[in-house]
UniProtKB/Swiss-Prot annotation:
It is found in: Cytoplasm. Residues 7-456 form the Hexokinase domain. Residues 200-445 are annotated as: Hexokinase large subdomain. It catalyses: a D-hexose + ATP = a D-hexose 6-phosphate + ADP + H(+); D-fructose + ATP = D-fructose 6-phosphate + ADP + H(+); D-glucose + ATP = D-glucose 6-phosphate + ADP + H(+). Its main location: cytoplasm. InterPro entries: ATPase_NBD, Hexokinase, Hexokinase_C, Hexokinase_N. It comes from Oryza sativa subsp. japonica (Rice). This is Hexokinase-7. Induction: Down-regulated by glucose or fructose treatment in leaves and immature seeds.
Length: 463
């Protein structure tokens, strides 16, 4: 009986292992498909599954910026206001203050002027606290605005809202320029401040990295969601209208989460997850690699095992059938369990899923499932990065330039197995020689610091 139950469970794991396999040849295919989709998205609007949004950021901060700059980070039920004092190459960020403010629920579905009025009044209070040290000499204060909702950007400091996501539904803001709305609200507060850049958090990650390291060419977010932005040559963007920027460069926000390709290793669990999601058929790459979904994929595998095998004993499946009850931090803790009897795995299974009295053999199987799902995610993320590097001719044999990738997000920062797998996969795909010139760096707070730095790099007072 026991042997049959174990064999049935092992069959499920063996099938998962095979379906999630990411040999180098397959990952090379993913990288090539990513580079191809990128080129198609740059050629024309709507030319690709990935949007390849022109950010209008043509200068990245390089450490020489000076002065006091502000940032507003709006992306969820809270927003953040931030103030940074920059003192050039030698001292960099000399002071940094921030404040987080909760948005009252009624404002998230009210009207536009109420929401932006509330934000502007919080900004005005924050500015009032800056003390006597701030010398503006009749200069306007400048702000970088991180707005983490879909926008059709029309210039560095203007963009119309395409639609709200998360818990927001303010109909009269859709189709309006969010910068103009904020600017108007600030004027009503008597606040003399100019929005000098509208960005998204991934562009901010690239900027925050680039401020400390001028070799950074790609910014990636690997957290609850996933995205990448990178520095492209402006003359390689056929859809870019008007004259090319003086710098010759343009930051592109890829929106790579929506990438999909026949090269991707997709299982029955991924297909079911996608079908039951709020956006079926969309964000396929993100659903394979981001922190929002890894725990949920593992839960679905465990549920199948419980249906095909009695390995978990006499189990009430209520918890195991609850979507998203297993989060990525939970699988990370199980994956990193170093106790000889995998005690932490036993505790997690009991606490989260009411799976009790597991054998050591069963717990090892659970760790293996976490490993299979996480390795696939990390290796696919690495292949995506290699696709971007190849698109811009970096990290290829003969290229001696140093290329650094700035990565932000809890999945990369806190999930050690994920991070190590991503880094070794990069080396494997780039090859020993080329990988010597490619490095990965953690870059924190693109949405706050990054926005303030882009405001500084695009200040109206620069010569």
């Amino acid at each position: 009986m026991v042997a049959a139950a174990v064999a049935a469970a092992e069959q499920v794991v063996a099938a998962l292992r095979e379906e999630c396999a990411t040999p180098a040849a397959r990952l090379d295919g993913v990288a090539a498909a990513m580079a191809g989709e990128m080129a198609a998205g740059l050629a024309e609007e709507g030319g690709s599954k990935i949007k390849m949004i022109v950010s209008y950021v043509d200068n990245l901060p390089n450490g020489t910026e000076e002065g006091l700059f502000y940032a507003l980070d709006l992306g969820g039920t809270n927003f953040r206001v931030l103030r940074v004092q920059l003192a050039g190459k030698e001292k960099r960020v000399v002071k940094r203050e921030s404040r987080e403010v909760s948005i009252p629920p009624h404002l998230m579905s009210g009207n536009s002027s109420e929401l932006f009025g509330f934000i502007a009044s919080a900004l005005a209070k924050f500015v009032a606290d800056e003390g006597h040290n701030a010398v503006f000499n009749d200069r306007q204060r400048e702000l970088g605005f991180t707005f983490s909702f879909p926008v059709r950007q029309t210039s560095i400091a203007s963009g119309t809202l395409i639609k709200w996501t998360k818990a927001f539904s303010i109909d009269d803001a859709v189709g309006e320029d969010v910068v103009a709305e904020l600017q108007m609200a600030m004027e009503k507060q008597g606040l003399d401040m100019r929005v000098s850049a509208l960005i998204n958090d991934t562009v901010g990650t690239l900027a925050a990295g680039s401020y400390y390291d001028e070799d950074i060419v790609v910014g990636v977010i690997l957290g609850t969601g996933s995205n990448a932005a990178y520095l492209e040559k402006a003359n390689a963007i056929p859809k870019l209208e008007g004259e090319l920027p003086k710098s010759g460069n343009m930051v592109i926000n890829t929106e790579w989460g929506n990438f999909s390709s026949s090269c991707l290793p997709i299982t029955e669990y991924d297909e079911a997850l996608d079908k039951e999601s709020l956006n079926p058929g969309e964000q396929i790459f993100e659903k394979l690699i981001s922190g929002m979904y890894l725990g949920e994929i593992v839960r679905r595998v465990l549920l199948k095992i419980s249906l095909q095998s009695s390995i978990f004993g006499n189990l009430d499946q209520t918890k195991l059938k609850t979507r998203f009850i297993l989060r990525t931090p939970d699988i990370s803790v199980m994956h990193h369990d170093g106790t000889p009897d995998l005690r932490i795995v036993a505790e997690k299974l009991a606490d989260n899923l009411k799976i009790t009295d597991t054998s050591l053999e069963t717990r090892k199987m659970v760790v293996e499932i976490c490993d299979i799902v996480t390795r696939r995610s990390a290796r696919l993320a690495a292949a995506g990065i290699v696709g971007i590097l190849r698109k811009i001719g970096r990290g290829v044999p003969g290229d001696k330039r140093k290329s650094v990738i700035a990565i932000d997000g809890g999945l990369y920062e806190h999930y050690t197995e994920f991070r190590q797998c991503l880094e070794t996969t990069l080396t494997e795909l780039l090859g020993e020689e080329a990988s010597k010139s490619v490095a990965v760096k953690l870059a924190n707070d693109g949405s706050g610091l990054g926005a303030a730095l882009i405001a500084a790099a695009h200040s109206q007072y620069l010569n």
